[in-house]
Amino acid sequence: MPEMSNKYVPAHMHDKNPNPKLIKFVGKVTDNIVTKLRGVKTTDPEYWGFACIFEDELTKEESDLALNLLLKMKLRKKYPYEKVLKLANANSENRKQVDDIIDKLSVLGMLEYDYGDKYTKDGPMPNVKRERVDRHYWVPLFVPGSAEYTNMNKALMDRHPELAMFFERMTFLPLEHVTAMVPPGGAGIGMHVIPVEKAISMENQTMDIEHLSYWLKRYEGHLGASICSCRYGRKKLDEGCADDYEDWCIGVGDMADYCNETGRGHSITYDEAMAILKRAEDNGFVHQITNIDGENKIFAICNCNVKICNALRTSQLFNTPNMSASAYRAHVDKSKCVACGRCVEFCPTGALKLGQKLCKADGTQVEYPKQPLPDNNKWGKHMWDENYRDTARINCHETGTAPCKTACPAHIAVQGYLKLAAQGKYREALELIKRENPFPAVCGRVCNRRCEDECTRGKIDSAVSIDAVKKFIAEQDLKAEHRFVPEIVVASNKGRWKEKIAIIGGGPAGLSCAFYLASMGYYPTVFEKNKMPGGMLTYGIPSYKLEKDVINAEIEIMKQMGVEIKCGVQVGKDVTISELRKKGYKAFYVAIGCQGGRLPGIPNETAEGTSTAVEFLKVANTGNKKLSGNVVVIGGGNVAIDAARVAKRSGAKNVTMVSLESRENMPASVEEILEAEEDGVKIINGWGPKEILTKKNKATGVVLKRCVSVIDENKKFNPTYNENELNTLKADLVIYAIGQTIVWDNLLKGTKVEFGKGNSPVADTLTYQTAEEDIFVGGDVLTGPKFAIDAIAQGHEAAESLHRYVQHGHMTIGRNRREFVELNKDDILVESYDNSSRTEAGVNEKLKKQPFKDANKTLTEEQVKIETSRCLGCGVTVVDENKCIGCGICTTKCAFDAISLKRDHPEASKMVVAEDKFKHILPYAAKRATKIIFKKKNKDKK
């Protein structure tokens, strides 16, 4: 069972002489049957939760007066103000004292009041008086009621944070034995999901009470926004979701007046309420309404984040959807779905997961498991899901989904943007790509295309030219008038975040992090020590592969989003992390890459005429330096290829690459090797450097020794040589491309950041947080040299961590681990497909003559149509109707009109008053018991 938080020790948990009146009062209010039967103990949350109110917030005299009054009042029975005075034995002498205690109890959440609930479906009744004498008071339930009201009182919570624990316990203990017996509609317990209104606008059978606009119109003029009790309470328990806790709860009718008058909220207009609802939908929050007063009254609309919501927990923890679910269920049109995963990412319950659209080899469809329901099953703790917030974030079924999305480190919705491109919706395709990658134009030129390596179409003939299509889509981003600037979606009702975040390093990881922080509403600052941002994109990749205007165009979009980039600033030298903290920076993302080059450890390795590939390429990228004579490049990877090709294109007469590995085992890609040879680079394999020959400390040649093996019996890089077999090459310039190193200088001086192998930082594998809690790391500085797309993916994840950290959210609860499974390509049946062969963009022969111009063409629109038609459409979203609660958030995320809500369970819109709950629970429980018996009998017969 979920244990109570141990964040705080309730002050009154072990009272030796508890107030008997308080014991009696909380025993009356509680709906925990266990507590009612055995009596209230001081260790019960009912007692210590209210003891901090009656013992610490009130004087002894006030407490006695308050409890005497409250004990005379029946639970949830409304008493006119004059009747309350009479119950309190008010007279001319103590009238002010009684009024004061009534007001105090209202502010503290022990009393609730309204002005007669004078509303109709057409709106508020006219001429309703709203003075003190017009109020009706009552003792509220714990939930929904006083537990929320205490948690909505920020000052009270700050004095008594154990009230957050009280709220959490009172949404668990009374329900753990009941939820399985609750019928559709919730039986007047707690809260009820109400769908996104647009999602049900085409349904003919909807009821007024299923529409948010109906309730807002009913109470128009009496609407208010308040602190979200769940968000604030969970934040107090260090389990926050990182949302701003202000104004997500909309009080309606007299509740809005109650909250405004007791300091819990403020008035808002109908339009302001609708704006909050839209903002909630943008963030993926679930709309819920109170469900304890029947179908003619609600008192709040909540916009709930499943990571912290105590109401949604009642259905998700216990796996009992009747506690929350609306009358609707999601349905996917497989013919339209492209497995982009947007609906999956936002589904609060995990009802949506990515699966397989293609048939299995035997022609059958993959069968997906369904969540068992308590309707005809025995229920207990073995059926609960205590990790529901994490399991809801599992992206796909174990049988797998589209290989392209799985293989991509950033898990871009490849199938989705190919479909949009096929429809000519290029801007929408670009938007979809940028959900996961802010550098589509860059990656369209330099990505190593793991998506294509795994493309299912490759099993038939050739993979789809995914990267070429992406490049075409991204071309519009290069023109200022057509650039797509993403919408800023902030989990706050107060505008963009004020917290300052520093990103140290302006390479792909740092800039990706900045992009996604900006998209969440921050104004991050990037500190880059070089004159231009981009890191290895700018200084490491030759311009014939990636021209700098492409990088600059995509960086310009980040600036438009609010990213500030400060170049020429070296943190640790020009300013320290400590100084940045003093300037208000709350967190740091260190993504400085591996900007140093490794040396081979041989004689004369630093002689004049030697360079690391990193430094050589940086110089070349900042002004094409002319070369001549003989150049030797030591190394067999893609960086070595780049250095060799740049040297050749810069005028070197002879360029020779020396690789330890055989040609078949070279780290460089086959495509890169062939292009290098086409440029005139000579490659010799199976040799390593022994010594640099010099004359007057200037390199003149390289002595090589035969490499016998590269990998040892433990599968580790551990080359061995035949020192007797030597070879000598003439060299005017020797370039080492044998690895990269981290150059820290004084960047982390004085911090607690720990280091592992070599001088790489140690960080949590999920959050990237270091031992210095406000410092996070990522990109090549953490992983070692990898591809741009790997750094981009890490930067995206780092943005999530930084957001959670600066907003005091929990670092891992409800976090998408971004884990995907590839479908079994050996167990599929592809019966029909477009027979077109793979399309290549080709090369511009004129540009090819210019050594540092990108001569690769972009696909034409017609070629894009042909190429996108080759996609087999492997993946699809699968709905588990048993887990779906009909919130409709999925429909707001789908760009393909592939998911919709259907009114499958109209009985779930039955709203009843809390006092009648057992009139509905008991008959349902009896039917359920009968079903379970018959199910067992049928099972026994089999």
Q: Whereabouts are the PLM-identified features?
A:
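FAD-site-proximal beta/loop scaffold in flavoenzymes
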Residues: 606-630, 711-785, 800
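Ferredoxin-like iron-sulfur electron-transfer modules
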Residues: 41, 93, 137-139, 288-301, ...
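Iron-sulfur cluster-binding cysteine motifs and their immediate structural context
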Residues: 64, 78, 85, 109-116, ...
